[in-house]
Amino acid sequence: MPTLTDPAVIKELLQRHGFSFSRALGQNFIINPGICPRIAEAAGIGPGWGALEVGPGIGVLTEQLCKRADNVVSIEVDKRLPPLLEETMADYDNFKLVLND
């Protein structure tokens, strides 16, 4: 999967899936390539750990968590995002998405 912090990759992914941001959900996705690895590192997550993420968006932080934790469970309320996450997280068998509010 190409880098999820590349604006061109993000734009193409969102357009392909017909996704537009929801103001009602207050959606803002992290795209700074240096932030997510630092967040995952600061959380101290490593082998033997699990991670629970609320609001994975397109999976930028999720990807970093999956690289470190044994299991990652992400909870998403936007019913439009699972197809995007299925694509962006396809390489990670330690990822599980829960669609719930």
Please identify what each model-predicted range represents:
Residues 1-101:
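Catalytic cores of RNA-modifying enzymes
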